Amino acid sequence: MMRHLISIGDLDREDINYILKKAEEFEDVARGEKKLRILEGKILGNLFFEPSTRTRMSFETAMKRLGGDVINMTAQEASSIAKGETLADTIRVVSGYCDAIVIRHPLEGAARFAAENSSVPVINAGDGAGQHPTQTLLDLYTIKKECGRLDGITIALMGDLKYSRTIHSLIKALALFDMRIYLISPEALALPEDIIEDVSAEIRRARLEEVISEIDVLYVTRIQKERFPDEEEYRKVSGSYRITAETLKSAKDSMIVMHPLPRVDEIHPSVDSTKHARYFQQSFYGVPVRMAILSEVML
Amino acid sequence: MRELVVSKIKEGTVIDHINAGKALLVLKILKIQPGTDLTVSMAMNVPSSKMGKKDIVKVEGMFIRDEELNKIALISPNATINLIRDYEIERKFKVSPPEVVEGVLKCPNHACISNAEREPITPKFYIKTEEMRATARCHYCGRKIENLDNYIS
């Protein structure tokens, strides 16, 4: 049984396949079509030291769909706690209130440190620029469901590859499967070299127009304004990394566009109605995947 | 007869073949600080047939534990240890890098939880050695560091 879920690197291919298979079994429940109360009497503690809407809500939905309860600490409450209490103490206290903790924290490694101080399982919901393993699992689940397989996929990762924790987690997991990976980003936001070195997969930098007709998945991330020294530079870069329905004209029919959301303007609304858009489906898949993780650590 | 740069010790630990210029870092790793009661002698840039130049540290009256001594391999993988009893070498060995070190290195990532003030946390690193060069990876944030001399806390 999985004790904590801190980094995608803690899981092997077999663990991932197991969680994805379990998630599939929960899909009817996630949609509310079937009732299942296997976590009745259990309490999940949501500790969000940084704002989050969808991750926090989808954990809450996952827990409630399985009959469990949730207690929440929001970023606002966290900031008042932070004035006087260490993370170690907060975790020691809250782990006495619940059966598992979900944590999002601005510092890298905070989830691992939380796990070391917790008497209940800890699930990492994002620690700074570090890891976001539940997002990675739902991304893999989306690829598997929508493309029918994980092995043999050609995927392009596009946008902010330097700071995006989603990308850093995802690329490690993609390397466990037989995938060809293209990296599409402005030079200033390229994937850090040490991550490329660590990943034993076929990886190549490319431009979208070179690979659009070849790829099975286009994974887009937000380019954050605050990463740029001036707004002019940001506008130049972000403008060239914007997907429209037109951009996708030469894509394969089966090619899917994914995005961890929220999007700003990197995917034009015209893409939403194309056969390629899967980002809303992807965010729904967060529920069955998180149900699988919660049931795994709590039962 | 060659003159000894540092006098012989009766009992204690001699750390030889330290990379030239690293003796002070060795003391730091062993947590021997100003104000110590120990008798410590140190020689820097001593001519060496094998290494060209080397440093030597002698700590009198104390047998330092192997796991502490092995941490020296992080900055000086060729270092040798002589444990001296009654002016004779009782045991001699080469340091070998530990797989995990706690509380020796400091993570350069300011956003790493191991640098958070007031948290009861000890930095922890996993060590990898290739061709006599050690690199380390932070247990908490995963940051990989080379040239470990720069990160001794």
UniProtKB/Swiss-Prot annotation, chain A:
Pathway per the UniProt entry: Pyrimidine metabolism; UMP biosynthesis via de novo pathway; (S)-dihydroorotate from bicarbonate: step 2/3
Enzyme class: transferase
Residue numbers binding L-aspartate: K83, R165, R222
The UniProt record lists the keyword Repeat: no
Chain residues that bind carbamoyl phosphate: R54, T55, R104, H132, Q135, L261, P262
EC number: 2.1.3.2
Catalytic activity: carbamoyl phosphate + L-aspartate = N-carbamoyl-L-aspartate + phosphate + H(+)
Keywords tagged on the record: Pyrimidine biosynthesis, Transferase
Entry annotated with the keyword Transferase: yes
Superkingdom to which the source organism belongs: Archaea
GO biological process, one term: 'de novo' UMP biosynthetic process
Any GO molecular function: amino acid binding
Family assignment from sequence similarity: Belongs to the aspartate/ornithine carbamoyltransferase superfamily. ATCase family.
Subunit structure: Heterooligomer of catalytic and regulatory chains.
PANTHER family: ASPARTATE CARBAMOYLTRANSFERASE (PTHR45753:SF6), ORNITHINE CARBAMOYLTRANSFERASE, MITOCHONDRIAL (PTHR45753)
Function statement: Catalyzes the condensation of carbamoyl phosphate and aspartate to form carbamoyl aspartate and inorganic phosphate, the committed step in the de novo pyrimidine nucleotide biosynthesis pathway.
Protein's recorded name: Aspartate carbamoyltransferase catalytic subunit
UniProtKB/Swiss-Prot annotation, chain B:
Cross-referenced InterPro entries: Asp_carbamoyltransf_reg_N (IPR020545), Asp_carbamoylTrfase_reg (IPR002801), Asp_carbamoyltrfase_reg_C (IPR020542), Asp_carbatrfase_reg_C_sf (IPR036792), Asp_carbatrfase_reg_N_sf (IPR036793)
Protein's UniProt keywords contain Metal-binding: yes
Positions contributing to Zn(2+) binding: C107, C112, C138, C141
Cofactor(s) needed by this chain: Zn(2+)
KW Disulfide bond (keyword) present: no
MF (Gene Ontology): metal ion binding
Gene Ontology CC terms: aspartate carbamoyltransferase complex
Keywords: Metal-binding, Pyrimidine biosynthesis, Zinc
GO BP terms in the entry: 'de novo' pyrimidine nucleobase biosynthetic process; pyrimidine nucleotide biosynthetic process
Cofactor annotation remark: Binds 1 zinc ion per subunit.
Sequence similarity: Belongs to the PyrI family.
Subunit text: Contains catalytic and regulatory chains.
Task of the protein: Involved in allosteric regulation of aspartate carbamoyltransferase.
HAMAP family reported for this sequence: Asp_carb_tr_reg
The name this protein goes by in its record: Aspartate carbamoyltransferase regulatory chain
Source organism: Archaeoglobus fulgidus (strain ATCC 49558 / DSM 4304 / JCM 9628 / NBRC 100126 / VC-16)
Lineage of producing organism: Archaea, Methanobacteriati, Methanobacteriota, Archaeoglobi, Archaeoglobales
Encoding gene (name): pyrI
